[in-house]
Structure formats: structure tokens, C-alpha cells
């Protein structure tokens, strides 16, 4: 993938392949029928329940990686739900945040010229340690695909790891350091964000505690398309 100029600031470096989702199983696998009728097994880079987005018969796009060492040549990247493309590759948001930090995607993170990935904090790892003229800040990133109406929600299942990250960020903030949590809303049809209390009540409670402690929440919207990804700015937080 590479940078692109124009309306989509981030473009896929090679064309994606269109198909139709036939099934998803064993969390990591998906049966897809390509446009030419070929039936293939694709890697599903999302181990969560994919609430509301794993719809059999829906159009999908796959990236193709024909390297001999790979067991599966195709990776499922996005699915179309109610006319909206939703990014499902959970490995992409962290890479795009890293990429976007260099290109001014996040005005809230201006003043940080250096970043370190996967920083140990207590017994956990935080995605980024940012440093620069603005000081230092710890930043955790969460991929968000579940939506009810125009509201994005996270998580869509109980996440003890996510709970621990919130506890760590609260502790970081209590120590006087800046702490941020960026929810990567991987679809363009959401204008609001809320914690997924229905699926993980404890996470929702910790989310509110983190807000009160001064942890900065950035529910960041993007528009996903078969050619690339465009930043849309922040959604409104609803608690």
C-alpha cells in the first residue's frame, strides 16, 4: 500500500479483487466466490464476532498475495453492508494510524514527531508512545466495525484485554502523563460513538471512568472504498 494524492489520501498499492462472501468459519477462514466464478478460501484477519457485518451473500474485496510461503493467497479486506463498505482487517488500523501521523490526519496529535510501537506499560503493551515538541503521550488503537444506526459501538464482545488497556490508560493519566484511545471507525455511515455496554458492561463502566480521569477518547471516522481510505474526522461521543 502506498500514499496517493487526491480525494483518497491512502490508496491500496495494487487492485483488490471483488467477490461474494459464502461463509466464514474457524474465525480465520472465509469462503468467497470471485467475480470469475472461482471459489477460494481467504484469510479472515478478524477474530471477533464481526457483529452486523458478517453477512453471507454480501460483496467483499480481497487483497491478493501470491507469495509461495503463504498458505492462503487472498486476504479479506472489506465487506459491503447496506451500501457502505466496512473495513474488517484488524491489522490495518495501526498501520494507518502510523501512516496518518506523518501526514497530519490527526490534528489532536499535532506536535508529536516521533513514535515508538508496542510500548510495555505495566503488564500490558500500548500501541504507541508519541514524543515531540508537545511532550509525550501514550496512544492505544481499537478497530471498530459494529454499528447500530448511525452509532458506532465498541466492543461487540467481552474484551478483558480492552478492559486492561483502559485501566492502564487511567493509571498513565493519574501519573500526570497524556493518554489517548483512538477508536478507528472503519465505516463512513457513523456520526456517533458509544461504548458497547450491551456486550461488555464492565468495559463501558471503565470507559466512563477513563473519560472522567482525563483519558482522551478519539472516535475517528474513515471512509473505506475498494481503492483506498479517506479520513472523515471525529464522531460525537455519546455516554
Swiss-Prot record:
**GO molecular function per UniProt:** DNA binding
Please give the InterPro entries that the UniProt record associates with this protein: SfsA, SfsA_C, SfsA_N
Cleavable signal peptide = none
Coiled-coil ranges (or none): none
Name the family: Belongs to the SfsA family.
User: Protein name, please?
Assistant: Sugar fermentation stimulation protein homolog
- Organism in which the protein naturally occurs: Synechococcus sp. (strain JA-2-3B'a(2-13))
State the gene name recorded for this protein.
sfsA
